[in-house]
Amino acid sequence: ALVVEMGGEPVVVAEEDRALYHAGLSHGANFIAGITVQTMRILTEAGISDPALYARPLLEAALDRALTEGTAGISGPAARGDAGTIAAHARCLSARDALAGERNTYADMTRALTRLLREARLLDERAATAVEAALLDPGA
């Protein structure tokens, strides 16, 4: 009933798959919310007074691309293999004690994106290795 109320299509999920189904939806909805909150904290720390105004269009576009294009819809420095930008992001996040949690999430999510892109053959080994190295030593 809740799915229909939210505009979704009901689906029958086998009993043995219900926890996995719920884990998948929780993974998406909860982590999008958490990353969005962290995004707002980073923007606020950068002096942006209304972070939602700046974040909303980009976040909505990224979600739409992910839903329609899958892994191919991932963009940004990890997808480009831009180790220099990744290192700059890691440095500025590390420099702010208030953003320690965001720094950890950034590193974890960059590694996860790199793994997805590598598996989909959208990022070559050399670029992926450079991105991961930039997270380990952002001063390099």
Predicted regions mapped to residue ranges:
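Interdomain hinge/lid region at the active-site interface
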Residues: 60-127
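Short, basic/aromatic-enriched C-terminal tail that caps enzymatic domains
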Residues: 122-140
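Internal alpha-helical scaffold of NAD(P)-dependent oxidoreductase catalytic cores
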Residues: 1-68, 95
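Solvent-exposed, non-transmembrane amphipathic alpha-helical segments
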Residues: 19-23, 30, 75, 79-83, ...
